[in-house]
Amino acid sequence: MTSSLKIWGILLALLCILCRLCVYSNNIYWREFIKLHYLSPSREFKEYKCDVLMREKEALKGKSFHMFIYSLWFKIQRACINEKGSDRYRNAYVWAPGALKVLECHWEKYNNRYTESRSFSYIEFHCGVDGYVDNIEDLRIIEPISN
């Protein structure tokens, strides 16, 4: 009897640990997306430079192309919320409701630096199974932004 109680106690403890992991890791893809693609409006858009950004972010070192989004974070997060605001799109492709500023970085191997292209663009996001943006799928440039 006591051994079966110990087993049930261990199983209950493991279940609690699993539930805790599910709750705390729910938005892990969203946090990773923001860490890699988000540019805060606390600085001017023109102040962001590809060479600096690509060097500062460890996960981007060595990449030949990357895209950054300059916007308030909740505008990006809102892309995965349905029109009524009552539910999230899950495992779906969704176009952001308005144009966002985008900084694209392209590696020039002959000049050994990144070139920049800035634009107002419509962005298609992928909403993950947790209902948060986890990837950029497509881009439609509306208007280039000159430096």
From Swiss-Prot:
Swiss-Prot/TrEMBL keywords: Secreted, Signal
Tissue: Epididymis, with predominant expression in the corpus region. Moderately expressed in the vas deferens; only low levels are detectable in the caput and cauda regions.
Annotated signal peptide: 1-25
GO biological process: sperm displacement
Pfam assignment, any one: RnaseA
GO cellular component, as recorded: extracellular space
Subcellular location: Secreted
Disulfide bridge map: none
Organism: Homo sapiens
Name of protein: Epididymal secretory protein E3-alpha
Gene3D superfamilies on file: Ribonuclease A-like domain (3.10.130.10)
Its biological purpose: Possible function in sperm maturation.
